Amino acid sequence: MNNPKIPARLPALLLAVLLLAGCATAPVNHVAADAPRAVPLQPLVKPRPVIGLVLGAGGSRGFAHVGVLKALESAGIEPDIVVGVSSGAVVAAMHAAGLRAAEIEASALRLEDSDLLDFTVFGPGRIEGGRLQNYVNEAVRNRPLEALAKPLAVIAAERETSRMTVFTRGNTGLAVRASASVPRLFWPVKIHGTEYVDGGVASRVPAAVARQMGADIVIAVDVSWRGSADAAAADVVIRPQTVRSRITDFSHKLANLAAGEDAAREALPQLQVLLAGAAANRPPVRPRPGAAG
């Protein structure tokens, strides 16, 4: 017997809502010409030792990366190439775009979780990720990876295989969004038919990538709870004593930023010795054939 209180069209309306929700649960396949892509890495060559900075995964603990940049900049140490994964990719993109540590710090202190996290009801995760993409693209003035002031590698992982992908070309914000898409929390990011998730799935601190990009001295910043074995490929590993909290908890950003600055300052003597030794032992760079002399 039909319930007279239920409109006859309600089941059809519910079905329509579910169908529309189903359409919204599939990640968009990004196939535009500016979609992020991986190309063979070209080592950077300079007449002095090349410094690589690797900023690791760690959610909101990634605010410590900003403190590390402050300490390095104060000491006159300027990275030549940058590698970022997950929250580290956000800071790495801003640094590679030419922002100074004070500018990144000011942006971080203004940041609210709602600026980055767009929660959804339907979908393969609780957070869609578009706000994060837009935030990064605005910070880098909508420049693609290859047009930033410094070489930048953004690390993501293929969802099906967990294999590492190193994005060095294309839309910076979209690459960072893929790198930070924590499985089951964020929607995966689909690029040219392949779904990508948080780069920390493949490597939380991919120090070896900086070597492949030509770094003579690799500085790795590990903000993960358990530490990352991949950081061992670095010459100097900075491990800030961050506050343990949910990866989306921004309430400890001041403490984490200070922890990053303190840890980097402690590492400065070791780093300065390494830089001096590398400069003394570096062979001269030979001019390329045909180059004007």
Predicted regions and their residues:
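Hydrophobic helical h-region of N-terminal Sec-dependent signal peptides
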Residues: 11-20
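Patatin-like phospholipase
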Residues: 2-6, 19-82, 94-293
